[in-house]
Amino acid sequence: MASHASSRIAKVLVANRGEIAVRVIRAARDARLPSVAVYAEPDAEAPHVRLADEAFALGGHTSAESYLDFGKILDAAAKSGANAIHPGYGFLAENADFAQAVIDAGLIWIGPSPQSIRDLGDKVTARHIAARAQAPLVPGTPDPVKNADEVVAFAKEHGVPIAIKAAFGGGGKGMKVARTLEEISELYESAVREATVAFGRGECFVERYLDKPRHVEAQVIADQHGNIVVAGTRDCSLQRRFQKLVEEAPAPFLTDAQRKEIHESAKRICKEAHYYGAGTVEYLVGQDGLISFLEVNTRLQVEHPVTEETTGIDLVLQQFKIANGEKLELIKDPIPCGHAIEFRINGEDAGRNFLPSPGPVSKFHPPTGPGVRLDSGVETGSVIGGQFDSMLAKLIVHGATRQEALARARRALDEFEVEGLATVIPFHRAVVSDPALIGDNNSFSVHTRWIETEWNNTIEPFIDNQPLDEEDTRPQQTVIVEVDGRRLEVSLPADLALANPAGCNPAGVIRKKPKPRKRGGHTGAATSGDAVTAPMQGTVVKVAVAEGQTVMTGDLVVVLEAMKMENPVTAHKDGIITGLAVEAGTAITQGTVLAEIK
């Protein structure tokens, strides 16, 4: 169970970072609950750390060294006196072993039961549950595949395209679509690598892929007493690399029969899985109207605000109540009021095919006004590294109708100013005026691969030539110190605070406004003359060539990873590989020469 009969949530530790940590901390404050933040070293100055009532350092620079470390998080809970843990989304939110460890430590787990997470998190088991619940399904492998040969065999039997998908995770990570038999081997290996990095397990299964489908989902809320409601639908069809960029609620252009099938099958699936908590049942809707079950996300979704804005339901507060063992106050599915659209503000360069773009945020000026909400994990002065997800914030707009929401979105996006690094705001500004998204009274034409296959990308690559800031000359400096892992802030005279030549004292680090990084005027093309260069900052996860190897134009040279996304770098001409300068695990910066082709 998520809670013990004799206990209620008294103090919440949020085992996450960024905007979702801020969201949960604010909900805790609304519920008059003290909150505890945890943070990796790169996040020591993050907003969620300051907003919480207490903050504890996890140490480490990567997810594995911090937010994925069971022991460090449970230790922080013990030190802080927190009796409940909210996992947010991503990281450990869908890790059944962590949920069980929290419960075994005598703490309240704000989420579904470990068994439900295990059953629905395993996408193969989830398909079996969906089948028992008589949910609509496309053909797929009954169990995870052992190798690429099994994937090829499935494709030969059922045809392409096929989807190779991580069995233990979601969010588009560890998912690849093969449209030819020849590319299956490479895509299978890439899916396994991504799944291993993101979820700690690399098993994958395969299913038929519906071409040009819509992505529609149902927001479920279920208590521990068997009561289940669907708080509405969402459309999340605007994606790149199978990761969502724009979401809206309620899902537009569904027939009454389709909406009924989604609501009812979502409830049947959750009942079959003995599910409680907030969760999302996802579907694909084909061009012909065919509905197919996709997966269940056993957590709060990134896009939950659009449901909140159209129902008036605070989904995080609902999670708190369910974990306390309370019954749902809702007795039937709410009727949505108005229309809401969410835009993920990612640190990616839309002008360069959405390449990850780590860097400093020298200016962050979000919009305000009627119908505008912002969920953010950054601010002016934040530094966005390549270790974590690329999302900086979420802009949510609400209107009485879909047309009004789109109009407010255009205004809000025009007001949104972010400087210092590339973001997807230029894409959002373009797409809200695109006829494919606007549609007519009956339909629109966007689908899950619309961005890659149909959108006319005329966005210029990001170039930032801002000068560096002058040195900070404030008379006071705030020093961050850690005492037994607990974060404290002390204000000291600047000359005393800067007495240490390294800019910090042995106990902590000085809070300074990060200087905007001056970027060159090049567009980050992966090639120049003979050189094959890195189009972005990241880590080499695969080297596909050897010194002296002959390659053809388009052949894979290396695979880079940044912000949890893999990006292939290919040969720009025919020739022989010389001067191969990297290996798997090498950290590189944008423009690094990886090899030459002579």
Swiss-Prot record:
<feature type="binding site">
    <location>
        <position position="295"/>
    </location>
    <ligand>
        <name>Mg(2+) 1</name>
    </ligand>
</feature>
<dbReference type="InterPro" id="IPR011764">
    <property type="entry name" value="Biotin_carboxylation_dom"/>
</dbReference>
<feature type="binding site">
    <location>
        <position position="282"/>
    </location>
    <ligand>
        <name>Mn(2+) 1</name>
    </ligand>
</feature>
<dbReference type="Pfam" id="PF00289">
    <property type="entry name" value="Biotin_carb_N"/>
</dbReference>
<feature type="domain" description="Biotinyl-binding">
    <location>
        <begin position="522"/>
        <end position="598"/>
    </location>
</feature>
<feature type="binding site">
    <location>
        <position position="295"/>
    </location>
    <ligand>
        <name>Mn(2+) 2</name>
    </ligand>
</feature>
<keyword id="KW-0067">ATP-binding</keyword>
<feature type="binding site">
    <location>
        <position position="295"/>
    </location>
    <ligand>
        <name>Mn(2+) 1</name>
    </ligand>
</feature>
<feature type="binding site">
    <location>
        <position position="297"/>
    </location>
    <ligand>
        <name>Mg(2+) 2</name>
    </ligand>
</feature>
<keyword id="KW-0275">Fatty acid biosynthesis</keyword>
<dbReference type="InterPro" id="IPR005482">
    <property type="entry name" value="Biotin_COase_C"/>
</dbReference>
<feature type="region of interest" description="Disordered">
    <location>
        <begin position="506"/>
        <end position="531"/>
    </location>
</feature>
<keyword id="KW-0460">Magnesium</keyword>
<dbReference type="InterPro" id="IPR016185">
    <property type="entry name" value="PreATP-grasp_dom_sf"/>
</dbReference>
<keyword id="KW-0276">Fatty acid metabolism</keyword>
<keyword id="KW-0547">Nucleotide-binding</keyword>
<keyword id="KW-0444">Lipid biosynthesis</keyword>
<dbReference type="InterPro" id="IPR011053">
    <property type="entry name" value="Single_hybrid_motif"/>
</dbReference>
<comment type="pathway">
    <text>Lipid metabolism; fatty acid biosynthesis.</text>
</comment>
<comment type="subunit">
    <text>The biotin-dependent acyl-CoA carboxylase complex is composed of AccA3, which contains the biotin carboxylase (BC) and biotin carboxyl carrier protein (BCCP) domains, and an AccD protein, which contains the carboxyl transferase (CT) domain.</text>
</comment>
<dbReference type="Pfam" id="PF02785">
    <property type="entry name" value="Biotin_carb_C"/>
</dbReference>
<comment type="pathway">
    <text>Lipid metabolism; mycolic acid biosynthesis.</text>
</comment>
<dbReference type="InterPro" id="IPR005481">
    <property type="entry name" value="BC-like_N"/>
</dbReference>
<dbReference type="InterPro" id="IPR005479">
    <property type="entry name" value="CbamoylP_synth_lsu-like_ATP-bd"/>
</dbReference>
<keyword id="KW-0092">Biotin</keyword>
<dbReference type="InterPro" id="IPR001882">
    <property type="entry name" value="Biotin_BS"/>
</dbReference>
<feature type="domain" description="ATP-grasp">
    <location>
        <begin position="127"/>
        <end position="324"/>
    </location>
</feature>
<feature type="compositionally biased region" description="Basic residues">
    <location>
        <begin position="510"/>
        <end position="521"/>
    </location>
</feature>
<dbReference type="InterPro" id="IPR050856">
    <property type="entry name" value="Biotin_carboxylase_complex"/>
</dbReference>
<dbReference type="InterPro" id="IPR011054">
    <property type="entry name" value="Rudment_hybrid_motif"/>
</dbReference>
<dbReference type="Pfam" id="PF02786">
    <property type="entry name" value="CPSase_L_D2"/>
</dbReference>
<keyword id="KW-0436">Ligase</keyword>
<feature type="modified residue" description="N6-biotinyllysine">
    <location>
        <position position="564"/>
    </location>
</feature>
<feature type="binding site">
    <location>
        <position position="297"/>
    </location>
    <ligand>
        <name>Mn(2+) 2</name>
    </ligand>
</feature>
<dbReference type="Pfam" id="PF00364">
    <property type="entry name" value="Biotin_lipoyl"/>
</dbReference>
<dbReference type="GO" id="GO:0004075">
    <property type="term" value="F:biotin carboxylase activity"/>
</dbReference>
<dbReference type="GO" id="GO:0005524">
    <property type="term" value="F:ATP binding"/>
</dbReference>
<dbReference type="InterPro" id="IPR011761">
    <property type="entry name" value="ATP-grasp"/>
</dbReference>
<dbReference type="InterPro" id="IPR013815">
    <property type="entry name" value="ATP_grasp_subdomain_1"/>
</dbReference>
<dbReference type="InterPro" id="IPR000089">
    <property type="entry name" value="Biotin_lipoyl"/>
</dbReference>
<dbReference type="GO" id="GO:0046872">
    <property type="term" value="F:metal ion binding"/>
</dbReference>
<dbReference type="GO" id="GO:0006633">
    <property type="term" value="P:fatty acid biosynthetic process"/>
</dbReference>
